[in-house]
Amino acid sequence: LDIHLHDSDYPLHVVLHYRVHADYDLIERSVRVINDGKTPVTLERVLSAQWHLPALGEYRLSHVSGRWADEFQLQREPLTVGVKTLESRRLTTSHHANPWFAIDRGQADEYQGGVWFGVLEWSGNWKLLAEVTDFGSTRVSLGLNDWDFAWQLAPAETFKTPVSYAGYTPDGFGAASRTLHRFTRAEVLPHKDTIHKVLYNSWEATLFDVDVKSQSKLAEIAAALGVELFVMDDGWFHGRKDDEAGLGDWWPDTKKFPNGLKPLIDKVQALGMTFGLWVEPEMVNPDSDLYRAHPDWVIHFPTRKRTVARNQLILNFARTDVQDYILDKLDKLLAENAIAFIKWDMNRNVSEPGWPNAPGDPRELWVRYVQGLYRVWGTLRERHPDVIWQSCSGGGGRADLGILRLADQIWVSDNTEATARLAIQEGFSHIFPANTMEAWVTDADAAHVPLE
């Protein structure tokens, strides 16, 4: 169903799009804005949906909050007159909140009670507004964050928002989560209900100290445990001795792998496992061939010093030349090597969010960055359809239905301590199905798990 709205004073045309997913009891909502005039129009706020609840109810909001290593902490609180705002301004979905909500009348549990719920399919800045008006009506608005947002709409051009999905169940929070799980597995995930392999990741064993010899030995240990997929984490690429150099130069380091990755991959396959690799394509170290050649490719303000965090800067994925460079390097890596799995990481938040010489309004950065990410990742998926991809962002900082159209799994948290993971994964499970949840078994310090 499309509802067409025309501004009576300006040549602006808005289309409210609805689609019913009857098999899942979900409604899809998005918005298109069309410039019917002869001059450009600048959009500064356009949400995907506003979901209205039955009138005169006293409602409770469920959402998740968190931080690094403590994501997806379930919160429940009453909604009172005013506006409750949840958002991300971090270029990713964020560790601190998630574009998901569940609302009940304060008495629902896992098995019974009416629950209204919804999500946003987007991997960048977002905003959720849960509002109780002075007339007692309750509504939830969800979409792109209007903070520092703008989009210049040329004549005859169309801007489309991300999609929001919402539903209702009389059977409690468990039924609400299972509805989202079924929909995500059947309609969103690239490999649907695929059962993923048991993997071994090199990071906590060797950190950056990787080479053919050390990783071959580690692969033998992994194979003896019955592991099916061996993943080499950070440290394998050009100039990577520690976290101060190498990001952006996505080819094997010739000192660590003088004959490329093939000898290690052959060893892993001979042991009966497939091979996976860690990358962080959106980042660059100042000490890298890429940055020395293209210092203008990072997100920055020309009048301010560039803030280096984790010894790295963020590549501007809104730029097509940046997209093409990363696409070329990763496509070559996958084409030349038998890589079955990629862990795509994104480890720092944005600062100085500038785009010098942007072709339009520089504030388009927030949306065009995510569109560029989707283009690169989506193209790689098309060219290498059998590869399994994992979304990681310093843990669970990029977890949403938008990224799950590209990634098969989400690294839920960098916190691998078992008792902490119980709460993290409980919150995660309200939104996402279990087959998207990646977890490790690691050693835990006695201070974290006291015998008492």
Predicted regions and their residues:
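Terminal connector regions
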Residues: 167-197
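Short Pro-Gly-centered flexible turn/kink motifs
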Residues: 151-169
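Polysaccharide-binding surfaces and accessory modules of carbohydrate-active proteins
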Residues: 1-132, 147
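Short loop/turn motifs at secondary-structure junctions
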Residues: 27, 42, 160, 225-226, ...
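Glycan-recognition surfaces
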Residues: 285-324, 367-452
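Active-site and adjacent substrate-binding regions of carbohydrate-active enzymes
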Residues: 13, 31-33, 207, 238, ...
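Aromatic-lined carbohydrate-binding/catalytic grooves of carbohydrate-active enzymes
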Residues: 191-328, 341, 358
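Short acidic, Pro/Gly- and aromatic-enriched capping/linker segments at domain boundaries
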Residues: 134-154, 386
